[in-house]
Amino acid sequence: MTDTAEAVPNFEEMFASRFTENDKEYQEYLKRPPESPPIVEEWNSRAGGNQRNRGNRLQDNRQFRGRDNRWGWPSDNRSNQWHGRSWGNNYPQHRQEPYYPQQYGHYGYNQRPPYGYY
């Protein structure tokens, strides 16, 4: 095997005309018509939202309900996993201790904030 120092100049020589007018394979590729993108139908059929053309499938699907009778996979315990926390943000809704933005900010050195500030 060759050293890395020797291989780099070899690659530079091998690919010097790559993707240029001298690259016959690349020029043939450019002449081809563009391919159409793949079409995937009903890729989100389980996710809800657009519910047209689904027939009676959504009316009585009790086998897909979890333990707590909510919609989801069988026995999916999402409500138990989140313990009442919202999904959207991680901002603490109920603080355990008071929040002071600066060490000795608006309320001075030895003053507590009003009761509803928590």
From Swiss-Prot:
Location in the cell: Nucleus
Modified residues (Phosphoserine): S36, S86
Motif stretch (RNMT-activating domain): 36-42
Compositionally biased tracts (Low complexity): 45-56, 98-109
Top-level taxon of the source organism: Eukaryota
Gene Ontology molecular-function annotations: enzyme activator activity; RNA binding
Cellular-component GO terms for this entry: mRNA cap methyltransferase RNMT:RAMAC complex; mRNA capping enzyme complex; nucleus
Chief place of localization: nucleus
UniProt biased composition (Polar residues): 76-93
Sequence segments annotated as region (Disordered): 30-118
Keywords: Acetylation, Methylation, mRNA capping, mRNA processing, Nucleus, Phosphoprotein, RNA-binding
Record-listed Omega-N-methylarginine modification sites: R85
Modified residues (N-acetylthreonine): T2
GO BP annotation list: 7-methylguanosine mRNA capping; RNA 5'-cap (guanine-N7)-methylation
Record region (Interaction with RNMT): 2-55
Residue spans of biased composition, Basic and acidic residues class: 57-70
Coiled coil: none
Sequence similarity: Belongs to the RAM family.
PANTHER family: RNA GUANINE-7 METHYLTRANSFERASE-ACTIVATING SUBUNIT-LIKE (PSEUDOGENE)-RELATED, RNA GUANINE-N7 METHYLTRANSFERASE ACTIVATING SUBUNIT-RELATED
Name the record gives this protein: RNA guanine-N7 methyltransferase activating subunit
Primary gene name: RAMAC
